[in-house]
Amino acid sequence: MLLDEDPATLIHHTIGNFNIQPDKQAVTRINDSLSTLQQSRELRMRDAESALRKLSRNLHALTAQHEEAVSSHDSAKHAAQMVELDTKKFRIAKAATELEIESERLEGELEMLKERLAELEAQGLEGDEATRREREADDATILRLKIYRSLGIDIEADEAGNFSKAVIRNSRKGDVHVVNMDPKFSRFFYANYFWSTMQG
C-alpha cells in the first residue's frame, strides 16, 4: 500500500515529477542580464563623472577669465554661456543620481531573485523538516501549490474541487492579476502566461 512506503522515498519520487530547471535557467539569465546592466551602468557613471569633471574645469576656467577680462567680454553672451554650462552640469548630475537609484533598485531585485532561487532549490532537495515531510508526503498537490505560492501565484479551487482561478502577484510592480482558467486551454499555455505576467 502507498502508506507502507517510507515517506522519504515517496517525497523523492514526488520531487522527481517537478522540473525546476527552466526556472533556474531563467533566473540565471536574469542574473547575467543584471550583471551586464550593472557593468553598463558603471561605464555610464564613469563617463558621466568624467564629463562632469570636464565641465567643472571649463566652468572654473571661464569664471577666471571673466574675472580677469570682464571689460573685454560681452556680459550678456558670457552670462548665457554660464547658464548653459550650469544647465549641462545639472543635467549630468541628475543623470548620475538616477543611475545610482536604478542601480540600487536592480541590486534589490537581484537579491530577491537569489532568495527565490534558493527557495526553489530547497523545495527540490531531500532532507526537509520532519513535519513538512509528513504533511506533504500524502498529497503531491500541496507541493505544487507551495511552489506556485513561492512564485507569487495562488491557485483557487471551485466547489467541485477543480482549479479554476489563479491570482498572480507581481511584487516588483505591485500588480495583482486574476486569471479565470478555462479547460480548453492547455497547461503549457497557462504556464507561459503565468511566467510572462510575473516578468511583465
UniProtKB/Swiss-Prot annotation:
Domain of life: Eukaryota
The keyword Repressor is assigned to this record: no
GO terms of biological process kind: cell division; chromosome segregation; sister chromatid biorientation
UniProt xrefs under InterPro entries: Ndc80_Spc24, Spc24_Fungi_globular_sf
Gene3D superfamilies associated with the record: 3.30.160.430
Keyword Nucleus carried by entry: yes
Keywords per UniProt: Cell cycle, Cell division, Centromere, Chromosome, Coiled coil, Cytoplasm, Cytoskeleton, Kinetochore, Mitosis, Nucleus
Pfam families (UniProt xref): Spc24 (PF08286)
Subcellular location: Nucleus; Chromosome, Centromere, Kinetochore; Cytoplasm, Cytoskeleton, Microtubule organizing center, Spindle pole body
Residues in coiled coil: 39-129
GO cellular component: cytoplasm; Ndc80 complex; nucleus; spindle pole body
Family note: Belongs to the SPC24 family.
Subunit structure: Component of the NDC80 complex, which consists of at least ndc80, nuf2 and spc24.
Chain's role: Acts as a component of the essential kinetochore-associated NDC80 complex, which is required for chromosome segregation and spindle checkpoint activity.
The name this protein goes by in its record: Probable kinetochore protein spc24
Organism of this sequence: Aspergillus fumigatus (strain ATCC MYA-4609 / CBS 101355 / FGSC A1100 / Af293)
High-level lineage: Eukaryota, Fungi, Dikarya, Ascomycota, Pezizomycotina
